[in-house]
Amino acid sequence: MRVRHGRNAAGETGAFSVTALAETACADAMDLSYPSGATFHDPETHRYVLWRTWARTDDGWPSPGRMCAFIGLNPSTADENDPDPTVTRCINRAKALGYGGMFMLNLFAYRETEAALMRKHPEPVGPFNDMLIRHVCGISS
């Protein structure tokens, strides 16, 4: 699994691989001090979690307990820097509801713009998807 972070306040980006299947490794990989990020299955055929944050505490972390999770069918083209129309709508909805950030999850992690093509993939769920859905739902509001 590969995790990529968007630029933080200092303009730095981050990317690294996580090989352990433990939830603690996933939690460590999702560094919420970055305002955006995404977890991918190498070579980015599957996207497991995408996040955006906009409301932060004085120490730079997202407001605790103020991140919501959206669950869609399958991811499209959004990544840690560029949203797609669905992610943009979810960001706007989360802001309107008063959240300080959001996670985007999907029932199937395979990245495909056409759901019919996604269904033909031999492994549309991805090996880390269920574990990461449980983890993110446990830390969201």
Give the residues covered by each predicted segment.
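Short connector loops at secondary-structure junctions
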Residues: 100-116
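Active-site and ligand/interface coordination hotspots across diverse enzymes
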Residues: 2-84
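Alpha-helix C-cap/termination motif
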Residues: 96-97, 139
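Charged/polar, solvent-exposed surface patches and flexible loops
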Residues: 52, 92, 131-135
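Short catalytic helix/loop segments, enriched in acidic residues and glycine
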Residues: 87-95
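Amphipathic coiled-coil/heptad-repeat helices and related helical stalk/stem segments
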Residues: 86-87, 129
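Glycine/proline-rich loop-helix segments at beta-alpha junctions forming the active-site rim
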Residues: 2-10, 20, 32-33, 112, ...
